[in-house]
Amino acid sequence: MDFLAQPNLPDLINYGLVAPRIKVLYIPTTKVACSTLKLLISQAEGAYNAQAAQEIITPNISQEQTIHNYRVHGLTRLFDLPRKEQWEVIESSEWMRVAALRDPLKRAYSSWENRILLRAPGTPQSILEMCGDVFVDGRVDVAATFKKFAQAIHHDRVAFAIDDHFRPQFNTLYANQLEYHHRIYIDRPGEMQTLADAINERAGTSVKLQRLNSGLGIKADQIFDKETADLIADTYHEDYEWFGFERHNFTAPSTSLVLNPIQQALL
């Protein structure tokens, strides 16, 4: 495939993270193991600041979430580099460019669970208002509430694009313009470790992968019926077209997952 970088590509991916010592560019995608990969690259670079992590923990920011703070991960943000250096990072054969992908249905559910169901700080109010909870006997039906989200984002994807958790992965990676040396699929066994090995070899380190920010443990087959899965797959059709994800095989005409009283109280 030929990669045709447009003049504004550095602006489109200016959230990319640069590890200058080991010459790695990482383009993070929300809800695609980005906490784990930021920590891996930060530690391999020797930039991780554990003291800063302790200083910024609050009731709304857990230890695991601190890795998203630039003081903690210590990596250079692409937008902080001069234009000439940005293009060197993007095009030079001396640099390793990496990214990760995730099954669109699993990513959509994970984003919704975190941003909408659990009301993560910073979630736009306009999105929360479009996705109110569905209750059964005073308790949230997670499957029905997620279906409501699937219908809303399918109807008006632009309204959700103000939050990068809900944008297609293609619109984050710009894979037709930027050549990646490692573009892993985190749902495929072993691919995360393969990337970790490549980064450790490059850095001369032995950093271990750490799984961070896991969700509520709800499985896809508890949530997706055929209609919901079709809506999400159509909403993120670019990701299927560009990255070759397998189509879903959910066939149930409906599904329901009502929280028990203890779960409802915790929510």
Where are these regions (language model features)?
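Membrane-interface amphipathic segments in extracytoplasmic regions
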Residues: 1-267
